[in-house]
């Protein structure tokens, strides 16, 4: 361990890493555990101390909200809204990667349309997935699979005047995305596994608090630990994602406002400035090694129950 500070997104990640180090290294290296501040642990490995902590990365929510308000009326966003013809917009924005659960998401949308034909012709799902790593065969195959799935669903349910899915591979600027988020009635963020996921936070920040959209979020994203008022889903369960989409589209305004207020408060609580401030504070503490008392100085394997890491209730622990 040659670092002063090692940062992770969640408390569960910290606990997993500490457990790994203790189980894999404690037989060959001398490890001592120190109790530190909330969400932080200090380990001494062969005489060198390293602070390990969770630092949930954030955004600048107020600045992003202003950006969304300004770009709601941008030419591209206005053209999109006009083309919708009054239909609800569902949006997903993800890089091309297996971990984002895009195939599973399209399967869920297929099930939603099959189970809720009252929505046929009344909503459009915009999936923005910029092409990357095209030279890697696995990513090229994934892109082809997504294009095939989107085409199949459009052919199955579409009409001459309506296309259920708009699947695009181009890159859009942050300002355009902010305007699109604000326009969307539902944000679909359903990765199979994700350390945090800033799209979820940007979608929340972009919403009009008087008439906000609804966030559907994978419970396997780090953001889900704080975003308990989102509609949390298992992305592997297409039926549950389809049901959440149906719930989001008919959610009463009062409930949408209450959920958004709670989510936006969390986005503001853990913004990028706090992330930066806590990281630098941890680095300072890690170098000074102040206020740390040895918890296991007798050579015995350290007891994880004494480590000062708070795990959120029902938090998903990534292995």
Task: Please describe what each predicted stretch is.
Residues 1-319:
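Catalytic cores of carbohydrate-active enzymes across secretory and cytosolic contexts
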């Amino acid at each position: 361990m040659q670092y002063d500070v090692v940062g992770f997104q969640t408390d569960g990640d910290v606990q997993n890493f500490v457990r790994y180090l203790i189980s894999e290294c404690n037989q060959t290296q001398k490890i001592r555990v120190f109790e530190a501040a909330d969400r932080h642990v200090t380990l001494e490995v062969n005489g060198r101390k390293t602070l390990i902590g969770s630092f949930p990365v954030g955004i600048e929510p107020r600045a992003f909200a202003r950006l969304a308000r300004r770009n709601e009326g941008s030419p591209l966003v206005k053209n999109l809204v006009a083309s919708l013809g009054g239909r609800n917009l569902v949006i997903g924005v993800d890089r091309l990667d297996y971990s984002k659960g895009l195939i599973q998401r399209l399967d869920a949308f297929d099930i939603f349309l099959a189970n809720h034909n009252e929505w046929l012709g009344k909503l459009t799902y915009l999936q923005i997935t910029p092409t990357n790593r095209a030279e890697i065969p696995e990513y090229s195959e994934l892109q082809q699979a997504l294009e095939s799935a989107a085409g199949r669903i459009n052919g199955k349910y579409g009409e001459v005047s309506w296309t259920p899915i708009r699947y695009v591979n181009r890159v859009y600027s942050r300002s355009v995305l902010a305007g699109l988020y604000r326009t969307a009635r539902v944000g679909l963020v359903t990765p199979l596994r994700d350390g945090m996921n800033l799209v979820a936070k940007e979608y929340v920040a972009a919403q009009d608090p008087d008439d906000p959209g609804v966030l559907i979020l994978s419970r396997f994203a780090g953001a889900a630990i704080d975003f308990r008022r989102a509609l949390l889903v298992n992305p592997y369960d297409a039926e549950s994602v389809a049901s959440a989409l149906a719930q989001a589209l008919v959610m009463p305004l009062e409930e949408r406002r209450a959920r958004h207020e709670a989510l936006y408060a969390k986005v503001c609580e853990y913004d990028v400035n706090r992330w930066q401030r806590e990281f630098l504070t941890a680095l300072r503490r890690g170098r000074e090694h102040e206020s740390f008392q040895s918890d296991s100085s007798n050579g015995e394997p350290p007891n994880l129950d004494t480590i000062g890491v708070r795990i959120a209730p029902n938090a998903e622990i990534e292995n």
